[in-house]
Every structure is written in structure tokens, then in C-alpha cells.
A protein has these predicted regions:
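C-terminal (or distal) subdomains of carbohydrate-active enzymes
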Residues: 327-330, 346, 355-356, 371, ...
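Catalytic alpha-helical scaffold of carbohydrate-active enzymes acting on polysaccharides/glycoconjugates
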Residues: 189-201, 221-236, 251-311, 322-333, ...
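Aromatic-lined ligand-binding clefts that engage carbohydrates, nucleic acids, or primary amines
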Residues: 81-116, 575-579, 589-590
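Histidine-centered catalytic/metal-binding microenvironments
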Residues: 2-36, 40, 162-200, 482-594, ...
């Protein structure tokens, strides 16, 4: 370690400007460009590159993980020594005053060394210290300080403030050391000598499961944080601590049982408060309604099991990046009635107008909502009072919540924080403090409920608009695993076997269809793609293992349900199974080569360019299975093709329509949708009535996307002003032509990235499928599809977590204008005066809309915190669906399900007695217009099914399960009985009503 400079080289400590505080910023020394030590504040780099920070008195150095070593010899001035003798600070009792070294920094690693010994460590999250100076310093012994700081990779580093602060040990403060702060408190209240309200104080430690550290670090941070909190409870009798995230408690229960037992005892004693809710602090705009429901079901079930003495009516999500409009419906159905967040204070444009309000979903369910105090705070009395005044002015409530504790990477409250709280507890100028549980605080807010404003919209975060597009691999993993888990649950119900039997869904952790792997990866810094590379590298094998387990579990259950093929049969029997209760439709699939028959009827086939053949299946309605027989020889004449694809050449030089290149313009259609191809690609699209959809050709565009501090989180607001080149190589080529499937291919380059676009139209399909494959090699670029609309949209709709939301196409208000990019989970649709155009997505994407345009953000390439984010081979799949009526009558939500959830196709199992394999095997009828199946899973205690259905339309709908099922009881979202159903005793089909946008739950049983 370099030696500290001598006292003669530094400004005299007597230059301190206050009796109670000495500013150290001018006194630090560092190596200058000439290699000599000099004042750190005078280093030329800061004034040149960060004049804004330099003007604030910060010590600054460059970003990129660079270290800066600061040195200072700290000497107690004679007048302070005299003050200490006067106060008795040097006697054995230790009464009088104390001195603390108060530091604040912006650095990702910090070490404070005093006389060669390290006394404190910090980082980007533990950003301050108040180290108590030893008694020897008061006696004139200088302290050699060395402060080692490393700048963040993404931002310049700074020592924000440094000072020695004197504090009285006697609450009476006979020396007036607190006078300056007391005057500041009075100034905040415009001269009022005393406060009219008080604080409710709860220690807290926000703990991200992964972010700038891998998950393994989180377990260690949780262990340290909870152990520290329990130790502080023994030292400070008033100390109460609250923490969320059942996933963390579950890890402690399994891996640190002794610590978890201490937590349970502290919970029983009313000092440690689990403020849980969902399984993790998940993203709430990129996950489906089914996943959000399961988040709450798993979290609530765990909380009720391990903390049985508490009511669990709280969703604590302080840091999640916005919330879908349907969130209240799902949360309230699972026993939650309070919702707390802080993130909307991050709005970059329009401050959120409420601190305390009622948040109502479109179905009428609502939550009481609290915008909490900041997280990661300390016990600074001025900051506390400033917040309390803002809270009281905004809410009308005199009692403000305060949450001291180091956050993000854990840590929680420190002893220094509570010593400072105790110091100010007895000061008349400071607001009184009440230490207690969050539940008690919320209970005292309950009387305000009737007078609270009602918010009937999504909670859109005006920031972090790039999260829906960054790291598409995580969105793809999430979509696939969720589908497999839902299918495994449904298959277990169809198989009719207990939850613990192989091939059926399990409800306990560690079983094959344990949802908790998926739920954990939906954490709000993993699924959005805003973590370091190690997080995603370590998640990859977990994704793969969970997919394989869920797939195996589903297949076993489906084979158990369907039985086996006839013994001794010559032709292989296959099953084509639809696992969503959708309306009847004929689908075209690519199957292994051969002649395929159903019920003795040969099915229409067409050779496929990628191998095998295209086959049009008979209509499948609801959840059902078709038995298909594969033969090597041709049977009788095939069945007629429904809505065959026809290709027509419109103009151009000599050449047949069957040539392998498109030389001019071609028209492609199947009676449900038609398109025109030309030199500019897809130049027009028509619906079934021949209404044109495009005002100009589809535009695949590339932009510069740079300059944002939160790189992986934020789209550049000015990206449209910085277009980049995109070139197509040659003409469009036909990949295959035929009545069942016709597809074209176009290749090109955008910068260093090779691009392949495939368009595909199948018989009887109402949409044009587009698949963009990209070898993405970019930095700070954005890839988008822009769709110019022929019919101007008045509004536009998209699905969101918990439901559907419609927005005005023409943004008028500042809040509407701020929503220039929003997340969509699986579809968006324009809403003109009649008809419209829908875009079906294969997973969450960032989307946008104006009256004349729909847009989809496809790929980004941020460099922080993951330098290689998004780069590599990417496959993006979407479809264009013209609507002859609005999106509701066109059943766009159901079409989106059909688009992204393929049929299950497997050979039948052998070794069985003969059965009748002619007709389809029905399981669950189509739910009906506007209804979506969220879940059908086995009951863990009975041989029943638990079904959750959502009405995705603004009209009342009726669910009819048909003769094969009886309804046992209506449930809430936690499987508790709300109402027994008696009408099933009459052996008649039951019609179950769902109000607009409503979610309902039932226990059902196969007849």
C-alpha cells in the first residue's frame, strides 16, 4: 500500500467550516497525470469530461472498472479536542460526543483502510458508511486513511461526499451539535417548529435474486442479511424487519434450517415480518396470465404453510418494471388486497399522481395500492422529513412509512442507522418514530379507503422500454417451458391419476412438473434480460432440464390417457392432439413422409422441402386427439383440400408460375387471406373480403439504439432519427409451392448480420406466417418491423399480463405520448372503424402503434450489463392476421394461442388390446367465444381437476363443459371453496357465466 502523505502536505484541518461537520472533499489526494500526488478534486479529468459532477464538488474518475486510490491524513483539530474534553467524551464512561467518518460513493467496489487495516467495504448498493472514529483520534493521534474505489463498468466513478460529523451522545445535546440539522428541518416545514405527523419505521433489505451478480451470491447475501437482522433485534428492542420473496425463505428452509428456525421464532414474536406475495418479485408485463396466477398460488401456498400465524394479503413488488392492467384481478383472486411498489417514482416524464389509491382491473376487482417510501435508504433526518412532507401533501395521511436498510444486494439496516434513529427520536424538531410491522401500518390506512382515488389503467413505467426486446432467448425459454408445464398439468387431469403418480402433475418441489424453476427465472432482472452474462449462462441448463422433465411428464400422461394401439396392427398409429380448448379448425402440419389416413379416409398431402410432407388434418375441436394411420403405399383418393393455396403470377417477363424465382409480382391466397409479392417484398395484404390492409410494403428496418444509461433496459427515444442500412440480396425465391403450403425466401444483410426471411401461407390458415432468422452481429442497434396501415386505426389492442388493454392510436395526453413503446405478450391489433389487422407473436415483444402504423421491435444489442446480449443466431416468428371484423369477433386471442402452441404429435404406444380408433377422442369442448383456458391441473388431494378460465372480451360469456364433466364447486384462486354446485346432480350440462374480463375457478370431475 502506498504511504500516506504527511500532514505538512495537506490543507490544515482548521479550515473546517462547521462546529459539527468537516468537509473532507478538498483534502483527499490522488496520483495526478504527472505521477505525483495532488488534490483529487483538482485532477483535470473530472472537469474536462464531467463538468456537471465537478461543479457539485465530486471526486471523479473514468468508467470501465478502473481503480482510484485516495489518501488523507485525518487529524483532530485542537478546538475539537477541547470540545471533547468539555463534553466528557474522553472519560471512561464515554459520554459526550462522538465523531463519524461519513462517506457516499458511486463505485462498484469500495474499501476503506485506516492505519493499514480495512474497516469497511461497499459497492454500488452499499453506497455509504458512517464509521465511528476511535478515542485515540480525539487525543491527537492522526489517522492514515486510504479509500480504494473501482468505477462501474457502465458509468464514471465518484466520491460523492466525505465529511467528519460530530454527534452528541447525550440526547439533550448541550453543545448544540444538532442545531444546524434542526434548522434545516424547520426550513423544510417553512418555519414550523415541530412536525404534525410521525414515521412508521420498518427495517428492510431489498434483495434482487440476480442482477450484477449470479444467483449463488444471492443465497449468501440472504444468509448474511437475515442473520444480521436477527442480531440487531437482540441489540435494539424496537427493531422490526420485513422481507419478501418466498423463494428465498424456501432456500433457507432447505439449506439453512437453523437460521430459518430463528426467522420463524422472530416471526412468531412479531419482530420479523414476511411481506410475501408471488413466489419471486417477478416481471409483471412479460409473463402470461397463467404464469402470474401460478406466481401467486405458489407464493401464497408457501407463506401459509411456513408462517401460519399471519394473514398473507400483501403483494410487495417495489422494483418490478411496471404492471399489467389485469394484475389486480389475479392478485385479488389469490387472497391479496394490498399492493406495494416504489418503481413508478422512476417515471422519466410524468410523475405518477398518487401515493395511496385503489387500483381496479377491467373486471371490477381491485386492490388497495401504496407507493412505498424509497428502498435502500438510511436514517438521515433531513431526507426522512422531506419524504414525510411529500407523502402527507400527496396522501393526506400524517403517518409516513420509512424503510431503512441497504438494498438490491441485501445488507439491510445497520447498527449505525439505528443509532442515528435513536438520536433523533428524542428531538422535538424531528417527527416521532413508531417501529412496527407493515401490516399494522396498512391497517391504519384502511379507514382512508372510501376516499381514495381509483386508477383504472395499467401501471405503465415510463422507463425501461427495451426490456420486452432484450435477450429474446430468455423470452423463448419462458414461453416454451410455460406451455409444457400447462400441457403436463392438463394431461395429468385427462389421465385421471393422482398427482404423485408418474405421468401426472406434481405439486411438491423437485417433482417433474414443479413450476418453481420457471417462476424463479421470471424474476424481474432475469426474464427482461438485464443481468450479467453469468446469470444467463447458469440459467441455460436449468431451462433445458426443466423442459425435458415437463415434456416427459406430459407425454407419459397423454399416453396413459390415450391408451395404446391395437396389438398386431400393421400400420403405425399416431396421435395428433390439440391441448387447447379452441374452436374447430383444419390445420396443416409437416409430418413424416408417407400416406396418412384418418377413419379410413386418405388425407391430402404435399411433399415438404425440409423433408416429410404437409398434411391437412380433419377439424379438431377443443382438447381432443385424432388417431392417424401412416402407410407407405397410397390409399384411395385423398380428401378435398379446404381453402387451398393458389399462386398467381400478375406480370413480368416470360416464365411459368412454377419457376424458382419471383421476377415481378405474384398474388398468393387461400380464400381467407391473400398477399401480393413484388420487388419490395410483401407489398399488399387482403382479408377474406378483399379489403386491402397495407398502405405501403412491409418495412424491415434497422436503427442505431445508443446513448441510454440503463443500456439493456432502455430504448433510445430518438432511435427513429438514426436509421441504418438494410439490403436484400437478389430476388425473392420460392421455397415450395403447392395447395397445402406455399413459401418464399428472401436473403439479405443488415450491417454485419446475415438475414433470412421466410414467408409461409398454408391451406385454411387465416394468417401469413413470417420467420426471420438472423445471425445477429451488432452493437447498439435495433431491428424492427414497421407495418403501414391502409385503414387508419382509432385504437389498438394488445394482450397484457392479466388480460387485454386497448389504447388510443393517436396519443394526445402526456401519459399517452409517453407510451411510445409497450410490451405485448402474444398479439396486437389495430382497431379502425371496421376490420383491422392483427400481429400474432411467438412470445413477448416491444410494440408500438399510431393511426397509420403498427410496429414490432425484434432485436436489440445492448452492451451492459451483458456485453454480448442478443448476439448470435436468432429466430423470430410472427404472423399477420387480417380481420374482417374487430379483434374480438375475429377471436384474435384464440388465434394467437393456436399460432404459438403446436399440436402434440407422437406414435401411439404398443402392447394393448384392440380398440376402435376411428373417431377423434374428445376431452374438453371448445370453451366458446372470448374464453381462454388459464389452467387445468390436478387437485393434489382429490382425483379432480382445477380449472381457471378467463373471459378476454367486454361481453358476458358462458362456459359449457359438456356432458363429460361435472362441476363440483366454485373456488377462489387458492383452491378454497366459494360455492358448491348442486345442478350437476341433475346430470345436465352446466352453463357458467363469466362477466367481461372476469377470471373464475372451479373444481371439475370427469363423468
Amino acid at each position: 500500500m502506498p504511504e500516506a502523505h504527511g500532514a505538512a502536505q495537506m490543507p490544515r484541518i482548521e479550515t473546517f467550516h462547521s462546529r459539527s461537520m468537516a468537509d473532507l472533499q478538498p483534502l483527499w489526494r490522488c496520483e495526478q497525470p504527472n505521477g505525483h500526488l495532488g488534490p483529487a478534486r483538482q485532477h483535470p479529468w473530472g472537469a474536462l469530461h464531467r463538468p456537471d459532477w465537478d461543479a457539485r464538488g465530486l471526486v471523479i474518475w473514468p468508467r470501465g472498472g478502473l481503480w482510484r486510490q485516495l489518501q488523507l491524513q485525518l487529524v483532530c483539530p485542537p478546538d475539537w479536542q477541547a470540545l471533547a474534553h468539555q463534553s466528557g467524551a474522553l472519560d471512561e464512561v464515554g459520554l459526550g460526543i462522538t465523531a463519524r467518518l461519513a462517506l457516499r460513493w458511486w463505485a462498484d467496489q469500495v474499501e476503506l483502510w485506516v492505519d493499514g487495516a480495512r474497516v469497511h467495504r461497499g459497492d454500488l448498493f452499499d453506497t455509504a458508511c458512517r464509521w465511528r472514529l476511535p478515542a485515540s483520534w480525539w487525543q491527537g493521534v492522526p489517522l492514515e486513511l486510504e479509500l480504494c474505489l473501482r468505477s462501474p463498468l457502465h458509468d464514471d466513478g465518484a466520491l460523492i461526499s466525505s465529511a467528519v460529523v460530530l454527534e452528541p451522545l447525550d440526547p439533550e445535546d448541550p453543545l448544540g451539535l444538532l442545531d444546524e440539522t434542526k434548522l434545516a428541518l424547520q426550513d423544510l416545514r417553512a418555519g414550523s417548529p415541530g412536525p404534525e405527523g410521525h414515521f412508521h419505521v420498518l427495517g428492510h433489505a431489498h434483495l434482487d435474486l440476480a442482477w450484477l451478480w449470479p444467483v449463488a451470491d444471492t443465497w449468501q447475501a440472504a444468509e448474511r442479511t437475515f442473520g444480521s437482522a436477527l442480531d440487531l433485534m437482540e441489540r435494539f428492542p424496537d427493531f422490526h424487519f420485513g422481507h419478501s420473496t418466498p423463494a428465498l425463505f424456501a432456500w433457507l428452509e432447505r439449506n439453512r434450517p437453523d437460521l430459518f428456525a430463528r426467522i420463524q421464532r422472530a416471526v412468531a414474536g412479531g419482530r420479523f415480518e414476511p411481506i410475501n406475495g408471488p413466489w419471486v418479485e417477478s416481471d409483471c408485463v412479460l409473463i402470461s396470465s397463467a404464469s402470474l396466477l401460478r406466481q401467486f398460488q405458489e407464493g401464497q401456498a408457501f407463506s401459509r404453510r411456513v408462517f401460519p400465524g399471519l394473514d398473507h394479503r400483501l403483494a410487495w413488488l417495489p422494483d418490478t418494471f411496471g404492471f399489467g392492467a389485469g394484475f389486480p384481478a389475479i392478485a385479488q383472486a389469490t387472497g391479496v388486497d394490498w399492493f406495494c411498489t416504489h418503481k413508478l417514482f422512476w417515471n422519466a416524464t410524468n410523475p405518477f399522481p398518487h401515493r395511496l389509491f385503489r387500483w381496479r382491473s377491467r373486471c371490477g376487482r381491485e386492490l388497495k395500492a401504496l407507493m412505498t417510501a424509497p428502498i435502500g435508504t438510511d436514517a438521515d433526518p433531513v431526507a426522512m422529513e422531506r419524504y414525510r412532507l411529500e407523502w402527507t401533501a400527496a396522501s393526506g395521511c400524517p403517518e409516513a412509512l420509512w424503510l431503512p436498510g441497504v438494498g438490491d444486494h441485501g445488507g439491510g439496516p445497520t447498527a449505525e442507522m439505528f443509532e442515528q434513529l435513536q438520536l433523533w427520536q428524542g428531538q422535538a424538531e424531528a417527527a416521532p418514530q413508531v417501529h412496527g410491522l407493515l401490516r399494522d401500518y396498512l391497517a391504519r390506512l384502511e379507514p382512508h379507503q372510501e376516499h381514495l382515488p381509483v386508477w383504472r389503467d395499467e401501471l405503465y413505467l415510463e422507463l425501461h422500454r427495451g426490456c420486452a426486446t432484450s435477450r429474446p432467448d430468455q423470452k423463448r425459454h419462458n414461453r416454451t417451458l410455460e406451455r409444457l408445464l400447462r400441457e403436463a398439468d392438463l394431461a395429468a387431469v385427462l389421465a385421471g391419476c393422482p398427482a404423485q403418480q408418474p405421468g401426472c402433475s406434481a405439486q411438491q418441489p423437485g417433482e417433474a412438473t414443479d413450476w418453481r424453476v420457471l417462476l424463479f427465472q421470471q424474476f424481474h432482472d432475469i426474464l427482461p434480460g438485464t443481468s450479467i452474462p453469468e446469470v444467463f449462462e447458469q440459467a441455460e441448463p436449468q431451462w433445458r432440464l426443466a423442459r425435458r422433465s415437463a415434456c416427459r411428464h406430459r407425454d407419459l400422461a397423454l399416453h396413459h390417457w390415450l391408451g395404446s394401439r391395437p396389438a398386431g396392427g400393421d400400420a403405425p398409429l399416431w396421435w395428433a392432439c390439440q391441448l387447447q380448448p379452441l374452436a374447430a379448425s383444419r390445420q396443416v402440419l409437416r409430418l413424416p413422409a408417407g400416406s396418412w389416413t384418418w377413419n379410413g379416409q386418405r388425407l391430402a398431402t404435399q411433399p415438404a422441402s425440409a423433408g416429410g410432407g404437409w398434411v391437412q388434418l380433419p377439424p379438431l375441436a377443443g382438447v381432443a386427439a385424432l388417431p392417424l394411420v401412416r402407410q407407405q403405399t397410397m390409399a384411395d383418393e385423398p380428401a378435398a383440400i379446404e381453402h387451398p393455396v393458389r399462386l398467381e403470377r400478375l406480370a413480368g417477363p416470360d416464365g411459368a408460375a412454377g419457376s424458382d424465382r419471383v421476377m415481378d409480382r405474384w398474388r398468393l391466397g387461400n380464400g381467407l387471406v391473400a398477399l401480393e409479392l413484388g420487388p419490395e417484398g410483401v407489398e399488399q395484404l387482403w382479408d377474406a373480403n378483399g379489403v386491402p390492409q397495407l398502405a405501403a410494403p412491409l418495412a424491415w428496418q434497422r436503427y442505431r439504439d445508443a446513448g441510454e444509461f440503463w443500456d439493456a433496459w432502455d430504448l433510445a427515444a430518438d432511435y427513429a432519427e438514426h436509421p441504418l442500412a438494410w439490403g436484400w440480396d437478389g430476388d425473392i425465391q420460392w421455397a415450395e409451392q403447392g395447395p397445402l403450403c406455399t413459401s418464399f425466401v428472401r436473403r439479405g444483410r443488415c450491417g454485419s448480420s446475415a438475414v433470412r426471411l421466410e414467408g409461409r401461407l398454408r391451406a385454411a390458415s387465416p394468417w401469413l406466417e413470417l420467420v426471420l432468422s438472423v445471425d445477429w452481429r451488432a452493437r447498439h442497434e435495433l431491428l424492427r418491423l414497421e407495418i403501414p396501415l391502409q385503414q387508419l386505426a382509432q385504437r389498438w389492442a394488445a394482450d397484457t399480463t392479466g388480460g387485454v388493454i386497448e389504447r388510443p392510436a393517436q396519443a394526445i395526453t402526456p401519459r399517452e405520448q409517453a407510451r411510445w413503446e409497450v410490451p405485448a405478450i402474444s398479439w396486437m391489433a389495430s382497431v379502425p372503424k371496421s376490420g383491422g389487422l392483427a400481429v400474432l407473436l411467438d412470445g413477448p415483444q416491444g410494440v408500438s402503434a399510431t393511426p397509420g402504423r403498427l410496429g414490432v421491435s425484434l432485436l436489440r444489442s445492448p452492451t451492459w450489463p451483458d456485453p454480448g446480449a442478443d448476439n448470435g443466431w436468432q429466430r423470430l416468428r410472427l404472423a399477420l392476421l387480417p380481420c374482417t371484423s374487430d379483434w374480438q369477433r375475429a377471436q384474435v386471442p384464440q388465434q394467437a394461442v393456436r399460432f404459438r402452441e403446436p399440436l402434440w404429435l407422437r406414435p401411439a404406444q404398443p402392447f394393448s388390446a384392440p380398440q376402435d380408433w376411428g373417431e377423434a377422442v374428445p376431452a374438453l369442448p371448445p370453451l366458446g367465444d372470448g374464453l381462454l383456458l388459464l389452467a387445468l391441473r390436478p387437485d393434489s388431494t382429490q382425483n379432480d381437476g382445477l380449472i381457471a378460465v378467463q373471459n378476454s372480451s367486454p361481453l358476458r360469456r358462458h362456459l359449457r363443459l359438456g356432458d363429460g364433466w361435472e362441476v363440483i364447486a366454485e373456488l377462489d384462486g387458492l383452491d378454497q371453496v366459494l360455492q358448491d354446485h348442486q345442478s350437476q346432480a341433475q346430470n345436465l350440462p352446466i352453463s357458467l357465466e363469466l362477466r367481461p374480463w372476469q377470471i373464475r375457478f372451479w373444481r371439475i370431475r370427469k363423468r
